[in-house]
């Protein structure tokens, strides 16, 4: 059976890496690893969504990041909208752990990470 980034518990050998990346006017520090989506950088599609997302302030409620991976989209939106809770879900246990660690490393508290 092959491993994919949507595998619950990747068997791929862990090879963590960290880097910084600017999103929405802030320099974020990310930790990523083998077995997660776009492990070496924030991919073009995610960057585009992050930079163009605009929240309708008239609509109440939380923000949901489905397939959060190591967290770049959810964390950038949590930073941009600190009054909102960002709920982040993923099937990949390694990715969820990284998302939690990245939230802590970037001092972002208005997020919760769940298994989907």
Regions found by a protein language model. Give the residues of each.
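Short, flexible coil/turn micro-motifs enriched in small/turn-prone residues
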Residues: 20, 30, 40, 62-64
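Residue-level signal for pocket-adjacent positions within structured domains
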Residues: 16, 31-32, 113
């Amino acid at each position: 059976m092959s491993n994919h980034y949507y595998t619950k518990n990747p068997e791929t050998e862990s090879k963590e890496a960290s880097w910084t990346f600017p999103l929405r006017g802030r320099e974020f520090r990310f930790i990523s690893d083998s077995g997660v989506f776009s492990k070496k950088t924030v991919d073009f599609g995610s960057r585009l969504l992050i930079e163009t997302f605009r929240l309708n302030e008239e609509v109440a409620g939380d923000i949901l990041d489905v397939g959060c991976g190591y967290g770049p989209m959810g964390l950038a939106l949590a930073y941009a909208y600190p009054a909102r809770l960002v709920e982040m879900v993923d099937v990949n246990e390694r990715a969820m752990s990284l998302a939690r660690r990245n939230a802590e490393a970037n001092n972002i508290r208005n997020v919760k990470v769940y298994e989907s």
